[in-house]
């Protein structure tokens, strides 16, 4: 190690710096809570299509949420089904 490197440090390669910055950005995006994933509206629509084949249910009766619990992502789906008439 030369005296200049010792005083001024080693210059990192731009690829290494870019990779490190990208990893920080990705980690920050993953850590953000309260944001819904992009696929939830599509999931909701497709669930509605499938459910409508079997049960008369409105879009207002389907609730989809995503949250973190104990370090894990949890996708919660609540569907309020209409009351069935007893025969």
Curated annotation (Swiss-Prot):
Q: Which UniProt keywords apply?
A: Cell cycle, Cell division
InterPro entries found in the cross-reference section: MinE, MinE_sf
GO MF annotations in UniProt:
identical protein binding
One of its GO biological process terms is:
regulation of division septum assembly
Locate the coiled-coil region(s) and give their ranges. Answer: none
Pfam families according to UniProt? MinE (PF03776)
Q: Which SUPFAM superfamilies match?
A: Cell division protein MinE topological specificity domain
Give the top-rank taxon of the lineage listed in the UniProt record for this protein. Answer: Bacteria
Q: Which family does it belong to?
A: Belongs to the MinE family.
The function of this protein is: Prevents the cell division inhibition by proteins MinC and MinD at internal division sites while permitting inhibition at polar sites. This ensures cell division at the proper site by restricting the formation of a division septum at the midpoint of the long axis of the cell.
UniProt protein name: Cell division topological specificity factor
UniProt organism field: Neisseria gonorrhoeae
